[in-house]
Amino acid sequence: MEPSPAKGKAQGRLLVSTSLDAKDELEERLERCMSITTSITNGLSEREANDALTAHVCKGPQQHEEVCLGLFTLLLTEPPQAQRCYRDLTLVNRDGMNVVLMKINQILMEKFLKLQDVCRTQLVWLVRELVKSGVIGADGVLMTLMKQIAGGDISSKNLWLAENVLDILVDQREWVLKSGMLVAMSLYTYLRLIVDHGTTSLLPLRQREVDFCIGLLRERFMECFIIGRDLVRLLQNVARIPEMELVWRDLLHSPQTLSPQFTGILQLLTSRTSRKFLACRLTPDMETKLLFMTSRVRFGQQKRYQDWFQRQYLSTAESQSLRCDLIRYICGVVHPSNEVLSSDILPRWAIIGWLLTTCTSNVAASNAKLALFYDWLFFNPEKDSIMNIEPAILVMHHSMKPHPAITATLLDFMCRIIPHFFPPLEGQVRQGVFNSLNFIMEKRVLAHLAPLFDNPKLDRELRSMLRERFPEFCSSPSPPTEVKMEESVPLEMDNHVLDKEDGCYDNTDATFSDDEEELNNKGKKREFRFHQLKETYIDEPSDITPFVDQLDEALKERVLQLQKGSDTETHCEVMQEIVDLILEEDFDSEQMSTLASCLAELFKSHFRGDVLPEEITEESLEESVCKPVCLIFRNLCQMQEDNSGFSVLLDLLAELYQKQPKIGYHLLYYLKASKAASGKMSLYESFAQATALGDLHTCLMMDMKACQEDDVRLLCYLTPSIYSEFPDETLRSGELLNMIVAVIDSAQLQELMCHVMMGNLVMFRKDSVLNILIQSLDWETFEQYSTWQLFLAHSIPLETIIPILQHLKYKEHPEALSCLLLQLRREKPSEEMVKMVLSRPYHQEDQFTTSILRHWTAKHDDLLGEHIKALLIKNNNMPRKRQSLRSSSSKLAQLTLEQMLEHLDSLRLSLSNTKNNFFSQTPILQALQHVQASCDEAHKMRFSDLFSLAEEYEDSSKPPKSRRKAPASSPRSRKGAAPQPCNEEESVSSSASEEEDSKPKASKRKRKGSAVGSDSD
């Protein structure tokens, strides 16, 4: 089982990398596990190897994980051994493949694009085998793999992945049909991909995709129904394909043939599409880049990011179909938090406007407009979200001045879609658009619509059509001065002033929102109308009618008691009875999902409002965890993990998590705040593994993100526990750190620093801190300063992170350079520090190297002189073409002789009018003389002023009788005066050293000059 050695590659065997990339932590870990595994089995027969591995995994959890990950890595990197490794893996694993599933999920979400081709092929093969074996959790992995199939991409790699995933779904059809979510996600994915596969060469693949989708729609329509209204949008795009047309006709005219429970297309169109489906059609990389633009990029500075995104994802004719996916994602998933509404972050409408204006295909442009208005058509204020309809009105509003054609096109589309979308439902569509416009005004997204609908920049025919369709919104507002003021704002630039006045939501924090999450944000600086919006939803009665009749009588009775009851104590008693019922042996597990839907609806008010008490005391904390939903947590804490009821309650929580994702961070809060849960934080890991995500890291990051969006105080409260309990998930990357520093204020930063200083919180460790600081270079200014302050609160030696200097550019990374500069000035320079400082490329405007060197000349001149001498002589002696290969500690450190001379010359100029005698030191003058003797004429001429210091030193070393003139002794009477660089004592010392170099016969001075003489030789 020993892997064949890598063929002369400096990079790892899993990921594609360059010599400049830092070693990937995940890759290092996996290769280390592979090495351990091969060392155990090396030279053994198959049976002996299996016995040895089995014995090793029995030693403990760590050894079990090492062997599982070692076999997993071997399987990815050694195709000939894959079957054997998988067989061994199934025999030795003790956790239902959980360790492997978690690693696959991590690789798919974080490293898939960097995987070597062989490893990518093997990973797909492994997923196929896991599905064949019916491993619990394989459906989650398969859905993550499907997410990597990019829309609008017909490259060979993407087609290969689409075809292989389809093979798995078709070959394992019976297994697929057991998971309703997998059925829906597969249908959503391949209905979308069919659009991209219309060329002649791809028709065989498209036909297979069509057959697969029709099979799911015919056999499992109600599972497909959970997609919601976007299922109709996707079917419209493929309805011209003959086989699909038959399904489309049945959908419109014979709904009962698809399912007895399906009443008609209106039932589907009034159902909102979950964000899970809208997000599944963006690859993790696309999603990351889009979230970066909507959460980190300032308005007005977006062009270079948009250009990059355009080149990467939207540059081909086929990729135009991706625009509707992006717009649906922005409208339905990327929702702003209250804390950033007044910031200058790039708003959603600006990105959508850019996507519309850069579209090069008429069909794609039409689909993009439909994607933008899709939630308008059947909008119901009681069920749908203002956040989904807001971008369209703001695109039109803000485009009126700079791009009136865009506004006109969208208004025209809005008018014409009413009669043409589906004529039998024209009345419902008109009502939906009317509801949208009315809700927009009610929530003051815009103060008035008349300036938009009756604008003189619109042509007469369009204005007439708008007045005819929407007379209610075309009357002039009162008082007219308000409209005049609003119109005077330069919309294309000063949109944020207008946003504050009109209550716009468009400065997003790029958060993943639940269906109701937009109502629950906890921004403190909000106008009262938004608090009213929250109250409206809180007072809304819970509607559990669709679910409650599916429960058995005992459960139904308790659930109805919960609905009728009002006080918390009664709710808790009933909830305990429900828990007791589901723990009974005869409980029907098929009711779990329905029960979770009821509980999520009944307890939705528990997930609004602040979780953490204003004043934190033992009593207030205990009181805060006395909600009915916390009874599930408490029962879990009281059980042993091997108890059968433990897994049942985890299943209930996992179902609840699908309906209400906020339950994740509520569980974390309970485990920290409740006395009953003391020392039970590991329960969260069991919960994460029980969810559809099946991955602790992903689950934890999503829950902390949800917490960040809802309650920053709670985020800070949880932070010490999360870092201490889950170090492998929190310390290996900067993901959680970025969440924290993105929202904390200066007081919360100081509080976290105190936790670090007292030893309650560790946010960095030596092996990963450098990578995290490098990641932070792309963050905002305050986020970077906060990160550095937290780093400095730790007792990590500066040498650990000094290689970051190689990544810092003086124009792009002033925050990191400032923090490093202040820290370096407190340090005593080591040779490695000096080397890294001098390794920075020389720019006249970049004063970093000169400033720290100058500071060190004042505080540690002797030490600095010795280090510079050693580096100068070492680099001067190196073969010129191989300097970078001889670097002592960092692949990035490419210290060249020319760089050193440039920085020293800059330092010389900086010190020229001071009394600093740094350049009169013997080591410096010896080194300069050594370099001058061997460098070429071009360098001698370029650095002549620097080398002249050594020449003057050489002249002063001659016998007294050969001195030129009496004034040569004048420095004695005016020590340190410019431009003379050295005092009398240093001259004598220098003379003594240099005389050894120039006149070896003077044996009495040999001791002082021996080091230089040896180096020169």
UniProtKB/Swiss-Prot annotation:
GO biological process, one term: RNA polymerase II transcription initiation surveillance
Keywords, in A-Z order: Cytoplasm, DNA damage, DNA repair, Nucleus
Domain of life: Eukaryota
Protein's UniProt keywords contain DNA repair: yes
Compartmental location: Nucleus; Cytoplasm
Transmembrane segments: none
Acidic residues bias (residue ranges): 983-997
Subunit organization: Component of the Integrator complex, composed of core subunits INTS1, INTS2, INTS3, INTS4, INTS5, INTS6, INTS7, INTS8, INTS9/RC74, INTS10, INTS11/CPSF3L, INTS12, INTS13, INTS14 and INTS15. The core complex associates with protein phosphatase 2A subunits PPP2CA and PPP2R1A, to form the Integrator-PP2A (INTAC) complex. Component of the SOSS complex.
Function: Component of the integrator complex, a multiprotein complex that terminates RNA polymerase II (Pol II) transcription in the promoter-proximal region of genes.
Family: Belongs to the Integrator subunit 3 family.
UniProt protein name: Integrator complex subunit 3
Organism annotation: Danio rerio
